[in-house]
């Protein structure tokens, strides 16, 4: 399969495509595309909405932070916001360029440990890493849709943390809903589920008869569920 056929096949023929990816595990092109899409989205967000608006919104929706900021004199508060604004965009760019590949590596290693270590699937790290990179391609579509929504909405109404209404959290009050519940609901995102299913399809294709689709899905969902619950617990503690 050529690279273009792989990129389109992930969406239209995932089983056949991931079988080819497992046989010849290349990962650079999908990883670069995911990174470029993320950087483009955050660049346009910084230009159209602005990081100061995002920072103020985050403070307004977190009662604990809001109480802390109210104790600070207005001049010092504005200076602190201005300082944080300078580094906010850099942080998101860093997260996209550095942390996304790192998280892919960690995810691949964990899935490999479960699939091969616990289930004797016999897959290799290079295969799983390539599968994770290609399975992340729906993120490009998510960023593209988010850009469209961003320019259709007023900058004050656009929510960077949850830009699309493809999860239950989009229909919840972010201020009054318990942060644990809100974080879990936000994690149940259509694109996240899509990525999970693609990863499981890829893992099954790489393992062949040594692993069922249910087993592959378990190997992917287990670490994701643990991470979601951990993140939701932390969000609940610090809300």
Where are each of the predicted segments found?
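Hydrophobic alpha-helical transmembrane segments and adjacent short intramembrane/lumenal linkers
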Residues: 127-239
């Amino acid at each position: 399969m050529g690279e273009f056929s792989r990129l389109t096949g992930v969406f239209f023929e995932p089983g056949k495509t991931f079988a080819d990816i497992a046989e010849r595990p290349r990962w650079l092109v999908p990883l670069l595309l995911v990174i470029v899409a993320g950087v483009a989205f955050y660049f346009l967000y910084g230009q159209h909405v602005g990081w100061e608006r995002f920072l103020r919104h985050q403070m307004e929706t977190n009662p604990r932070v809001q109480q802390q900021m109210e104790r600070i004199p207005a001049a010092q508060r504005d200076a602190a916001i201005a300082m944080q604004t300078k580094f906010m965009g850099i942080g998101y760019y860093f997260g996209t360029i550095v942390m996304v590949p790192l998280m892919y590596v960690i995810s691949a290693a964990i899935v490999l440990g479960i699939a091969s270590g616990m289930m004797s699937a016999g897959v290799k790290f290079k295969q799983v890493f390539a599968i994770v990179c290609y399975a992340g391609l729906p993120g490009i579509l998510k960023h593209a849709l988010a850009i469209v929504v961003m320019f259709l909405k007023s900058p004050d109404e656009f929510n960077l943390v949850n830009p699309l209404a493809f999860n239950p959290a989009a229909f919840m009050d972010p201020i009054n809903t318990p942060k644990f519940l809100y974080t879990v609901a936000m994690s149940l995102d259509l694109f996240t589920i899509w990525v999970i299913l693609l990863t499981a399809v890829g893992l099954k294709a790489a393992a062949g008869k040594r692993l069922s689709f249910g087993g592959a899905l378990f190997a992917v969902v287990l670490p994701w569920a643990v991470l979601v619950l951990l993140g939701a617990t932390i969000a609940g503690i610090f809300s």
